[in-house]
Amino acid sequence: MAKSNNVYVVNGEEKVSTLAEVAKVLGVSRVSKKDVEEGKYDVVVEEAAVSLADTEEVVEEVVTEEEDILEGVEVVEDEEEEEAAEDVEEPTSEEDSEDEWEEGYPVATEVEEDEDEEIEYPEVGDFEDEKAIKKYIKGLTDEQLQAWCELEGAEWVENEHRNINRMRMAMAIKAVHFPELAKKPSSKKKSKYAEYTTEELVEMAIDNNVEVRDDKGNERILRMYTIIALREAGLIS
């Protein structure tokens, strides 16, 4: 039976009915309506009545081919939050907070070395454990951390948000020095709709006069809504 209240589809697959449940699924302390509207998280609001039973299978299949796009939007998992909590120390005053801290990360207030002087970065085997490398990373600027990653050949997916990008660089360089700590890639089931591009699905809907819900400019949401509409019209199985 369809529900009349809003349903939040989190990460394209898990459906919950409240923002508190959305935050719990994402592993963050709080998610506001504004966060959802601005697209800060991968959350889709089902505004109209939609049969959850009909949608569940589609969302589950569609999300498998889209998950690579979301790499690291598992960026604030419990493990990373705990690490951030350990690493960040509160500044001693409001003035210190403005001058020496930026979005939870310490920034250098004085240039202790010549900017042109090349840093001699540690090599693999120089750190005793993960705690030691984490302490070393804390003392690097974003530019120095990036240079170290590039020097070591560490790979990460860049993100426009500074904190997320820094976290990914830190995880990438730690994986080089401690490969046993790196997360193993999970095997993913290929969606049976992978053979269709989003454009082909949309064209199929247009050719058959199938109405597709407003995607609000998000291509992944457009793809999901188009597949749902085509399934309901009996054009794909």
Swiss-Prot record:
Biased composition (Acidic residues): 73-103
Ranges in a coiled coil: none
Region described as Disordered: 73-105
Function according to Swiss-Prot or TrEMBL: Hypothesized to function in the shutoff of host biosyntheses. But it seems dispensable both for host shutoff and for phage multiplication. Its shutoff function is probably not entirely specific to host activities.
Protein name: E3 protein
Organism: Bacillus phage SP01
